[in-house]
Amino acid sequence: MKFPSFLSLGIAASTTALAALPDQKPIGDTIADVHLGKFLIELAPGDTRWVTEEEKWGLKRDGRKFFDITAEVEQNLFPRAFAKTAVTFPTGLHRTVEVMPLAAQLSKDNMFSHLTTFTSFHTRYYKSETGIQSATWLMKQIQKTISSSPASNARVEKFEHPWGQFSVIATVPGQSNKTVVIGAHQDSINMFLPSILAAPGADDDGSGTVTILEAFRVLLQSEAIAQGNATNTVEFHWYSAEEGGLLGSQAVFSKYKQDNKDIRAMLQQDMTGYSKGTLDAGELESVGVITDFVDEGLTEFIKKVVNGYCDIPFVLTECGYACSDHASASRFGYPSAFVIESKFEHSSQHIHTGQDTIETLDFNHMLQHAKMTLGLAYELAFADI
């Protein structure tokens, strides 16, 4: 997501990393080929420029965030022309009796086990062979989660992309086509040499990936959810290529808009595991509720969910334009929100380097994000929205 303030971490180990690399064959980017290797990015509303891929990474190293909107040019899309979906969210929590026993089933051990394997791939860079392998492994875990649950109508599908690594979408049908989306991004990147250096991506965003996977597992244990009795459909998304400019999530929500899908809410979980920055600053452990470029009504409801289902409070924070995949939902007119591990300035400084490892994470903190995710998914599954 963002880039750490120091640049030396990945370089120091580069000689060792280069000596023991698995074969990483880059996969072609057909969209960029049309424009002779250049990409159209948007750094702020209306602020666009054509850049090379290396210029993209340079901007990210400088902490600049952006949409890669090259595909919009190819498809003649104009997302800002889309009408915003108007949704009225509940004024309080109505499913605590059902959610509390489910929340007790959330497992730190499951998240640790999944993340241990997920971070063992050399990189989950979206153009790499190991990025495809990690996506394949993730999809198999989701399939196992569904097959071991009572939810016979739940399903998981690939959402293919031209760059290789696919996004993954799991669907739990309800009584209507109104849909609540829970998202995280599965790719990782080492911002120094993306195609070569290791990118374990434990926090960014392996933590969000396994957090929502665990919430998904427990949600399917609900008899009402498993039998399809929820008012609304719930989807869990694991996006490819967030690090390339929100590419995977843009492709998903662009397709959803073309198909007239009725998305009522989208929550992004990107970086859920690092609490040390907050504690080192002498502040209370908390989750960070993003307040800029999000839907105000959904964000207000999420505050209630945190207060009702988490054991720690929230703090309000900002992350800027196009800072994670919720921005893609907003771009196509869908209400979205984002909850991160802390105040933005206290989030992990290890990301986008080989030092973003599982040892830096706090699984008790991730459990709080899982409780919030489960609570939101269940409450909105049965809400009149």
From Swiss-Prot:
GO molecular function, a single term: metal ion binding
SUPFAM superfamilies in the record: Zn-dependent exopeptidases (SSF53187)
Disulfide bonds: 319-323
EC nos: 3.4.11.-
Propeptide intervals in chain numbering: 20-87
Domain of life the protein comes from: Eukaryota
Summary of the function given for this chain in its UniProt record: Extracellular aminopeptidase that allows assimilation of proteinaceous substrates.
Family: Belongs to the peptidase M28 family. M28E subfamily.
Name the UniProt record assigns to this protein: Leucine aminopeptidase 1
UniProt source species: Ajellomyces dermatitidis (strain ER-3 / ATCC MYA-2586)
Gene that produces this protein: LAP1
